[in-house]
Amino acid sequence: MKKEYSCKEIERFVQKHWEINDTFKVLEDSKKDKYYCVSMMPYPSGKLHMGHVRNYVLGDVIARYQRMLGKNVLHPIGWDAFGLPAETAAINNKISPEKWTISSIEYMKNQLKLLGCSYDWSREIITCDPKYYKWEQLLFTKLYNKNKAYKKKSIVNWCPKDKTVLANEQVIDNLCWRCSSNIEMKKIFQWFIKITDYADELLNDLNDLKLWPKKVKVMQRNWIGKSKGIDVLFHIKDTNEKILIYVSKLEIFMGITFIVISKEHKLIKFIENKLPSIAKLIKNYNNEKTLELNLRKKTKDGIFTSLFAIHPISKKILPIWISNFFFTNNDIYQSIAAIPAYNKNELDFAKKYNLPIRYVIKDYFEKIIDFKKYNNLKEGILFNSNIFNGLNLKNGYDRISKFLISNKIGKRSTHYKLRDWCISRQRYWGAPIPVLITKENKILVVSENELPVILPKAKNNNIIHSLNSYKDWIYVLNDNKLVKREVDTFDTFMESSWYLHRYTCTKYTKDILDPNATNYWFPVDQYIGGIEHATMHLLYLRFYHKILRDMNFVKCDEPVNRLLCQGMVLSDTFYYFSKSGNKIWTSPKNKNFERNKDNKIINAIDSLGNKLTHIGMSKMSKSKNNGVDPQGIINKYGSDTLRLFIMFAAPPELSLEWSDKGIIGANRFIKKLWKITYNYLNLKKNNNYVFYKKLKEQDNILLEKSFYVINKVTKDIDKNQTFNTAIAEIMKLTNHLNSYINKNEYNNISIIKKVLMIIIRLLYPFIPHVCFVLWNEINKNNDIDKTKWPKIKMPFIKNKKKNIVVQINGKLKTVISFDISCNEFLIKKCVIENNKIKNLLNKKKIKNIIYVKNKIINIVLDDK
């Protein structure tokens, strides 16, 4: 064994060994317990950043640990290769998206191998490969034939910069999730999948996900947004027309003061026919433009229709308005009954147009409740509510509901915020939708034997945003008739919604999936990824899994048993404005700056002299150009050092602020472990050791500490997933072993070996390269990749006792010996029941018992 630790030499040797021996390749084995561990697949964005490293090292640590438990572990990897990031990067680099994507994959794949990730590379998926998206297209045709997919004209979220539609889940605070552009609303033909058919199941099955973060489940519940209420018919004064409105907050029903309808409401036609002056106003009312402002507008625009609805209980007249402050894609419900006293947007509108505001709730102190207090209100009394005055909120809800139903004014109804999933995008770099359209606009799905429909090649690297321009690809013959291909492509979440299933059978060519493989591996035992995917990928994944179950490709109801949402890796983030006014994000490494007395960055400039604005720490991302390339760290310190730092720096679910300082400490620890092993081998080689049949006290202490650490680390990795505390315990044990070796004149070599082997096995999931070599040095020709996790064995360790001093009113009475495992309750119970103490107490009343852990019990008597 060499005296000095050489990370490059070690890691190169070990990685070659893994590759030559296909160490992590796995097949189904019914004789073994399976474990399916996977991290969310990356976009091939060019290079891995530290956020990637954290995600994939987390998964690798868990996979390696589970292998050591003797399980058959599937740990695959793939690439989410379609979509805007690759297309934008390709345009910027003036090459085709395909070439950019493949070159990025090769680079990032090499980085993952350098990290030492234990993937089964034979199962690698690239979603832009026709061999993958062929089955996605087939699945879509099956959904269409089952009436689960459809095309309709719909108002959609439109990103003017990326020139594509966004699903509701991809709009954050009315901004594009990718480029932060203001979202507009357009009405165009789009493809949808009926996720709403599964709304109840998606909601109810959240209760079965015991090992998912509570926050993710809350986010999905809120997104699905199930509510129960009443569909109420409002008659329009002096007409035969009616408006159907869904009302969920029945306790404040008497506070309705006006009605709002959208421009899409069927009543608009009636207005245009009967009220030409209003029709002209409607025509000039650019709904598409104003809708983009939606709820972000401080003031809401509207048109009074000159019509009035009649409140079904109070018979008061309610003016009907057309407005932009609410939006729905629901064809039936295009109206709301406004209760401005208890809704901020409706209140703003009412104030602007001088509409009535009717408060209907007081608290028990006769104080009127407004919208600020209403949402968190638990108790209140109705007033201004006619026959319902004096009722509390619950009774008011029940009585008003009963009145509406019994008088046939309304009927019970269940609503969801969830809308069908818009899956079509107006971009080039995506999987083609396998549909043909005839001259008569009839839709034909492409037959299975003609799949995949392959994306046309970009000509001369000239990227055209839409497939509309590829005329030679669009027009084809079908039954000797000229038809047109669908020019939209799939949303990339279509690819990522089922890749976990395809990992189980990547070489299977008979159908979408091999049920034998999916039913062996599913559900996924551990899934790792960011919480930002809670209402997008994770919801679509659950939905697709249920579709695949209903097609008999898999049996279980949920795809993922345990979910770990790792925290973000943050780094300093800078930008400047170009001459054209565009915000340009610049890399943290290409800048100079100063720090003020509060340690805040000031006077930052880049290498070109641009004055930079520092926005603090933010998530590493390609879009903000603040990612740190791990390659420099790996080149200098090795991937084991990087892995150890990433796992030790913070609990996995919390954000980690990146700095290079912790790297040095992690590297120092690995060198210490190397030195301890080197010294042990020298002790053995020079015969400077003894074997003791009888263990000395320091031996017992070291062994007892070792078995405590095994137990603690096992719980931290397996149950708690607090990997940082697991590493901390191993470091303490390593320091203890080092002290044992340095302080003792005569070392028990068998104890050193035993503890050292425990440490190396405990560290193997975290720093596999150096542990592989150290293990092989201690146990010649023995492969740690096939070694079991250490078990607790303590038969040779005496049961330690703790002596507790017993006092009465502060005076020493006796000392009682207890087993070290006894807790406070047992100790107090035994002391009180001790015969000597019983006699001393002589039935006197005890006022208090004070316990100082593992030291003293003081019984305080009542003087009375």
From Swiss-Prot:
A molecular function GO annotation: leucine-tRNA ligase activity
Motif extent ('KMSKS' region): 619-623
Keyword Transcription in record: no
Catalytic activity, reaction form: tRNA(Leu) + L-leucine + ATP = L-leucyl-tRNA(Leu) + AMP + diphosphate
GO biological process: one example: leucyl-tRNA aminoacylation
Residues binding ATP, per UniProt: K622
Main localization (coarse): cytoplasm
Swiss-Prot/TrEMBL keywords: Aminoacyl-tRNA synthetase, ATP-binding, Cytoplasm, Ligase, Nucleotide-binding, Protein biosynthesis
Domain of life: Bacteria
A GO-annotated cellular component: cytosol
Short sequence motif 'HIGH' region: positions: 42-52
Entry EC number(s): 6.1.1.4
UniProt subcellular location: Cytoplasm
Gene3D superfamilies noted in UniProt: 2.20.28.290, 3.10.20.590, HUPs (3.40.50.620), Isoleucyl-tRNA Synthetase, Domain 1 (1.10.730.10)
Leading EC class: ligase
Family that this chain belongs to: Belongs to the class-I aminoacyl-tRNA synthetase family.
NCBIfam families: leuS_bact
The protein's name in its UniProt record: Leucine--tRNA ligase
Species annotation: Wigglesworthia glossinidia brevipalpis
